[in-house]
């Protein structure tokens, strides 16, 4: 059993230069089904530091989203089960934390942007109510204060006429605007790390670029770590510092983006480049 001792930088909330914000170490996740055991993640390792962007690449079924859901603590268990490994946030293994400890990290310290904003947002609640809920739950502010903060967030992610649109519902926004609402929701409590799971898949090329530029700008402003999950190498070429290529639940290769573009070692990476 590993004993973790907090140092002064952890107590103060600061990390030493070069210290990973999040580390995934030898992670194994499997699903128990009627047909047997399906191994979804097989010994994945990667890390991300404050202000750094890690792109996790892979096709459907590669295990990239299962890894992200395990980090967030939102994977259904059962049927899912972590059989081995560590997920270290600021040196603390989240897999050994209680549900209450994980809940305090989720949203406050590590937030997630989901692929399908329309499904992730509640269709019967206004976007202002959903944005404000983060402040009401975690900060105990009044409804009026929560609404004001929601408008500020909508302005921050450049949703036009935020004050007039705060009471609108998700279906009244375009796909690009809904994704901006998801970004605003993730940013609401100024987390250390954001995990963006295919955040631009359903958007056209122009809107994709706008969303990625916005994410990069906000990341730099708040010095957040960013894990960008995607199957599209073109999306990450200009924003990622390093990549981790996943294939059949394993990390095929990784490292600085430029090195992997110029000298891809794994066949799957070459296929992604050619696609």
Explain the meaning of each model-derived region.
Residues 1-274:
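ABC transporter nucleotide-binding domains
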């Amino acid at each position: 059993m590993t004993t973790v001792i907090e140092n002064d930088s952890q107590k103060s909330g600061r990390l030493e230069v070069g210290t990973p914000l999040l580390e995934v170490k030898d992670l194994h996740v499997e699903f128990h089904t009627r047909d047997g055991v399906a191994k979804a993640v097989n010994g994945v390792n990667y890390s991300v530091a404050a202000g750094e962007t890690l792109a996790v690449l892979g096709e459907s079924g590669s295990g990239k989203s299962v890894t992200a859901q395990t980090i967030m603590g939102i994977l259904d268990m059962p049927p899912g089960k972590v059989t081995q490994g560590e997920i270290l946030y600021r040196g603390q293994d989240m897999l050994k934390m209680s549900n209450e400890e994980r809940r305090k990290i989720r949203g406050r310290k590590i937030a997630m942007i989901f692929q399908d904003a329309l499904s992730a947002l509640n269709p019967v609640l206004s976007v202002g109510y959903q944005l404000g809920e983060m402040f009401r739950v975690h900060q105990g502010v009044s409804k009026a204060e929560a609404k004001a903060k929601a408008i500020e967030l909508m302005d921050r992610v450049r949703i036009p006429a935020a004050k007039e649109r705060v009471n609108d519902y998700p279906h009244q926004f375009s796909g690009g605007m809904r994704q901006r609402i998801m970004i605003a929701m993730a940013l609401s409590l100024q987390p250390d790390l954001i995990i963006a799971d295919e955040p631009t898949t359903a958007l056209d090329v122009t809107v994709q670029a706008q969303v990625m530029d916005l994410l990069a700008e906000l990341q730099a402003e708040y010095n957040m770590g960013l894990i960008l999950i995607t199957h599209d190498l073109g999306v990450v070429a200009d924003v990622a510092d390093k990549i981790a290529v996943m294939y059949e639940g394993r990390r095929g290769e990784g490292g600085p983006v430029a090195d992997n573009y110029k000298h891809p070692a794994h066949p799957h990476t070459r296929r992604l480049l050619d696609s």
